[in-house]
Amino acid sequence: MARFHRPSEDEDDYEYSDLWVRENSLYDYESGSDDHVYEELRAATSGPEPSGRRASVRACASAAAVQPAARGRDRAAAAGTTVAAPAAAPARRSSSRASSRPPRAAADPPVLRPATRGSSGGAGAVAVGPPRPRAPPGANAVASGRPLAFSAAPKTPKAPWCGPTHAYNRTIFCEAVALVAAEYARQAAASVWDSDPPKSNERLDRMLKSAAIRILVCEGSGLLAAANDILAARAQRPAARGSTSGGESRLRGERARP
């Protein structure tokens, strides 16, 4: 309780008024028996307190209640006792839907395919098999049965060959020489046989040991013409092979039966 005074005409006479602060105030004032003005004012102001004052009193009371609880916790910590912590939250139950799912199967390894011409990355492709050997240039021209001819490139006589021209001309030259040499060897063998035809196995063995046929191909610039003539003659011969004038069939290395 706080006490205020106001001066009057007489310096020794004071009129006091009081204001209610809260219970257990720091101002401990005791009214005297001769202070009738103070008693009247106190009786007049003993009604209910305003709402704002009640809210402030409740707030102070709640703050005062929190402070002793905090002080008690500090005392327990200083004494070495532990304050019980709040109970931990219960463990989360696993979902039955997750446990019922089957395990995921492992992914299949990627299948490597051979790289094509249009693909840019062919380093990781697996080789399917060994590459097929290519036929030499000119082999198709010989197998076709058409007349043999050297390559027409280049146009000028002194220009160097480039690319597959060298391999093509080599194949044509070897085929032409083989055709001419085979025809000469056939004619020489027929001449040796007809000069002294063997009549027994003994004479045949003697002729085989003494026969020496040498073939010389020197056609020059007419090599391709001679080879093409041989090809034309072979096309006109009968298709029957191994037939003789006597009608007996003989295989290579096999002698005719008597």
From Swiss-Prot:
Tell me the compartments it is located in: Virion tegument; Host cytoplasm; Host nucleus; Host Golgi apparatus
Gene Ontology cellular component annotations, sorted alphabetically: host cell cytoplasm; host cell Golgi apparatus; host cell nucleus; viral tegument
- GO-annotated biological processes: symbiont-mediated perturbation of host chromatin organization
So which domain of life are we looking at?
Viruses
- Basic and acidic residues: compositionally biased ranges: 249-258
| PTM info | Highly phosphorylated in the host cell. Packaging is selective for underphosphorylated forms.
User: What keywords are annotated for this sequence in UniProt?
Assistant: Host cytoplasm, Host Golgi apparatus, Host nucleus, Phosphoprotein, Virion, Virion tegument
Q: Where is the motif Nuclear export signal annotated in this sequence?
A: 204-216
Instruction: Extract the ranges annotated as region (Disordered).
Output: 66-143, 234-258
Q: Which GO terms describe its molecular function?
A: histone binding
Q: Map motif Nuclear localization signal onto the chain.
A: 131-134
Is the keyword Phosphoprotein assigned to this protein? yes
The annotated regions of Low complexity compositional bias extend over 77-118
Q: How does it assemble?
A: Interacts with gE (via C-terminus); this interaction is necessary for the recruitment of VP22 to the Golgi and its packaging into virions. Interacts with gM (via C-terminus). Interacts with VP16; this interaction allows the formation of a tripartite complex composed of VP16, VP22 and UL41/VHS. Interacts with the capsid-binding protein UL16. Interacts with host CGAS.
Q: Which family does it belong to?
A: Belongs to the alphaherpesvirinae VP22 tegument protein family.
What is its biological role? Tegument protein that plays different roles during the time course of infection. Participates in both the accumulation of viral mRNAs and viral protein translation at late time of infection. Modulates the RNase activity of the virion host shutoff protein UL41 probably to ensure necessary levels of key cellular mRNAs and proteins. Plays a role in microtubule reorganization that occurs after viral infection by stabilizing microtubule network.
The protein here is known as: Tegument protein VP22
State the species of origin: Bovine herpesvirus 1.1 (strain Cooper) (BoHV-1)
